[in-house]
Amino acid sequence: MAQGQQPILVLPEGTSRYLGRDAQRMNILAGKILAETVRTTLGPKGMDKMLVDSLGDIVVTNDGVTILKEMDIEHPAAKMLVEVAKTQEDEVGDGTTTAVIIAGELLKKAENLLEMEIHPTIIAMGYRQAAEKAQEILDDIAIDASDRDTLMKVAMTAMTGKGTEKAREPLAELIVDAVKQVEEDGEVEKDHIKIEKKEGAAVDDSTLVQGVIIDKERVHPGMPKKVENAKIALLNCPIEVKETEVDAEIRITDPSQMQAFIEQEEQMIRDMVNSIVDTGANVLFCQKGIDDLAQHYLAKAGVLAVRRVKKSDMEKLSKATGANIVTNIEDLSPEDLGEAGVVSEKKISGEEMIFVEECKEPKAVTILVRGSTEHVVSEVERAIEDAIGVVAATVEDGKVVAGGGAPEIEIAKRLKDYADSISGREQLAVSAFAEALEIVPKTLAENAGLDSIDVLVDLRAAHEESTYMGIDVFDGKIVDMKEAGVIEPHRVKKQAIQSAAEAAEMILRIDDVIAASSSGSSEEGMEEMGGMGGMPPM
């Protein structure tokens, strides 16, 4: 700079900027730290994490996406890996930990290639080629199956190591029945399976209700507690006298006018109730409020009514009973009513709940999850959600792959052969991608207390003979996973590898990180805090 020339500030004061290798090193390190955090939770022998938030609420889980959501992560590169886990959860419901640790390992291998002076663009290109080839290999080794036995095995594999060991089989039965029940034209709408959790009793006391459970109670004690052969009305409007939108005053000059006014209000409420009762409805679910007087008249008519039901529950009730949700009482007709064998109010763990059961061919069902404590019930709920996702994926795709690290080893083996056919430096990236996939069986072995090097060597040798050889973490042997019944949906692996590759590729392409200083804090303050959210300092 020439003497006396004024420095030019392009960025605001206090902004941190990292270029080139510094930016890549920092982002890769953040990704590796995040992957290491969830790595110990992988597999049937994976450990749990205890997460305590600022209010002292505790979550005990080994579900990858739950851990990452509960952690207060601020580093931008680490946040990208959290998005990988969320995408995996939304798409297939399982394989979140697998996706994150593969992404972390891809970044680790990329770091070695960067030190060999290989350009990030070449590494990214090689990773993309490897990911595309991996998808082809996965399609080739997939097993066509969607029979009940396969679905049971898929569900049990997904729940292994998630606090459901003793009740794996009965829970798998419930999940397969639930998915099969809501399936329509080969597609499964997972939102139509409601999971209602209540502490108390044992995990294997969990049940499947062919209908919907509503966590509400009757609006009036005079209403029947149980209605058989229920005719159900669903209303999305209040049963009360409408308030005027403008302020209005009524001048009363005579007490009889006041009485007439009150009687008119009562008559309006009575007419509303009569129009419901006249359709033949003996059960009413209302999304809005029900006036006290309307409750009285409904109780006199022997109608079981529930108010302020959630919109999502109303939609499930419609799917389960065949009722139409009506937004105007005057439009309610007998054709809009749904049917259920029994609607009753039951006490579960000291709380009243409404059970809508024995629906004919319901397209919405409920799994009532039980467990000894709130933490147990929450972890079982997460395991069931994962299992529903994988069973639904298997029903829709009709394809599965072996578990126990078998597909990763097979893909790695074939990718190494494929790498030899590639000219140029991309070959090194494809080989690195193949090695990165071996992190899955390696982690499964380490978490089971086995020697990961011995296991990997044995697995590679076994795959010269069979595609389906994987590690049985319970006895430490290499077995045929297909024969052992350890299988996973094809979609879970496909999505995990695809998401991990895309995230790693995106992070590698970043060569400049510009971080604006947060208001009221200095760069030194960030350094003292250990960078962003406990990640490498920026």
Swiss-Prot record:
* Keyword flag ATP-binding: yes
Q: Where are the transmembrane segments?
A: none
Highest taxon in the source lineage? Archaea
- Locate the region Disordered: 518-538
Q: Which Gene3D superfamilies match?
A: GroEL, GroEL-like equatorial domain, TCP-1-like chaperonin intermediate domain
Which Cys-Cys disulfides exist here? none
Composition bias (Gly residues) maps to 528-538
In terms of SUPFAM superfamilies, this protein maps to: GroEL apical domain-like, GroEL equatorial domain-like, GroEL-intermediate domain like
Keyword Nucleotide-binding among record annotations: yes
Question: What GO annotations for molecular function exist for this entry?
Answer: ATP binding; ATP hydrolysis activity; ATP-dependent protein folding chaperone; unfolded protein binding
Among Pfam families, the record links this protein to: Cpn60_TCP1
Q: List keywords of the entry alphabetically.
A: ATP-binding, Chaperone, Nucleotide-binding
Looking up CDD domains in the UniProt record yields: cpn60 (cd03343)
Subunit: Forms a Heterooligomeric complex of two stacked eight-membered rings.
- Tell me which family the UniProt entry assigns to this protein: Belongs to the TCP-1 chaperonin family.
What is the role of this chain?
A: Molecular chaperone; binds unfolded polypeptides in vitro, and has a weak ATPase activity.
Name the UniProt record assigns to this protein: Thermosome subunit beta
